[in-house]
Amino acid sequence: MFKHILIPTDGSRTAAKAIKAGIQLAKEMGARVTGFYAQEPLPLHIHGEGYIADKELVAEFEKRAAEYAAKCVAEVSDAAKAAGVPFEGVVLKSQSPHKAIIDAAKQQKCDAIFIASHGHKGLTGLVLGSVTQKVLVNSEIPVLVFR
């Protein structure tokens, strides 16, 4: 049914469970997987208009953000490799993670998105996390929500 599944992660425990389930689904379907992380750009209050930021502070933030993004994508990579599922990793900088997830799915030509019900921000919106809700509402391809 699905040949290419995007599995976004934010590094949360719920996302880790979704990664395992998404990889298992991909394996059973003979699909490949793209692991995805939406890296938030430098917060405006650190380098915003009219504010001169310390270059070392900015560099340290960027370094740590990139390391965390790589760690998150590596979690998907490790699970895919262990299951023998073809894998590709993608990181995009975005202030709108839901848009980045949808854009990544389009760019990578995925035919489904397998996403955790909620991430680091908890149970926003009662049942689904706000990012997951926005992906569900705006995606043009099937979205499978793991809870």
Predicted stretch roles:
Residues 3-55, 79-88:
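Small/aliphatic-rich secondary-structure junction motif
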Residues 18, 45-48, 99-102, 125-127:
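Short, well-ordered secondary-structure micro-motifs
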Residues 50-54, 105-108, 131-132:
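Short, hinge-like loop/turn segments at secondary-structure boundaries
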Residues 75-113:
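Structural beta-alpha unit
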Residues 131, 139-140:
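Short, structured coil segments at secondary-structure junctions
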Residues 143-147:
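Short hydrophobic/aromatic patches at helix-to-coil boundaries
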Residues 55-71:
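A short acidic, glycine-rich active-site loop
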Residues 112-134:
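Glycine-rich, Arg-bearing micro-motifs that act as flexible, cationic patches
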